[in-house]
Amino acid sequence: MVGGISRTGWLVAAALVALLAAILIFMGRPPICPCGTVSLWHGTVQSNQNSQQISDWYSFSHIIHGFIFYGVLRWIMPERALWVPLAIAIGTEGAWEILENSPLIIDRYREVTMAFGYSGDSVLNSVSDTLFMVAGFLAAGRMRWWVTAALAIAFELFTLWTIRDNLTLNVLMLVSPVEAIKDWQAGG
């Protein structure tokens, strides 16, 4: 067992991540940044490399996804082996990554969020986003709930201050756009 997950659980997790990568490649997503480089971090939001590299400002949102999935799934199924809720979390995150890279959501991001030139994620970035979610999931299992909540709030405030965007604003702007928020974000 590693991190409270059995060998079987890790194999299931790896298979789900591999399936996500295969689906994204089948959808025509670029394996890596079309610019031809692979970077550990890319910090410029309004850039053709945003959502193309291993990590970026939105990696914090994926860690928060892991916090949320852990809390909800352990509450729903407290007696299940940890790999079961982890597999469900990976499947859910993977489904979002697939949807996020569909023309419907790419166009929606361009219309109503600060991601004016967004063209979707590279496969590398989507897989990395999923692995950041896994890290958040596993971290939440080792922290008290209030520490996890405080860290999520800190991540939200930090990214809001730094790039004028975060998970909360991203969801709000996708679901019910507010022109004043879009204007404020564009001013940053």
UniProtKB/Swiss-Prot annotation:
Q: Which UniProt keywords apply?
A: Cell membrane, Membrane, Transmembrane, Transmembrane helix
User: Membrane: is it a keyword of this entry?
Assistant: yes
Q: Identify one Pfam family in the record.
A: DUF2585
Transmembrane segments annotated in the record for this chain: 8-28, 57-77, 143-163
Q: Which InterPro entries match?
A: DUF2585 (IPR019691)
Principal location: membrane
Q: Could you state one GO cellular component term attached to this entry?
A: plasma membrane
User: According to its record, how does it sit in the membrane?
Assistant: Multi-pass membrane protein
Listed as disulfide-bonded, the cysteine pairs are none
Protein name, entry field: UPF0314 protein Sala_3154
According to its UniProt entry, this protein's organism is: Sphingopyxis alaskensis (strain DSM 13593 / LMG 18877 / RB2256) (Sphingomonas alaskensis)
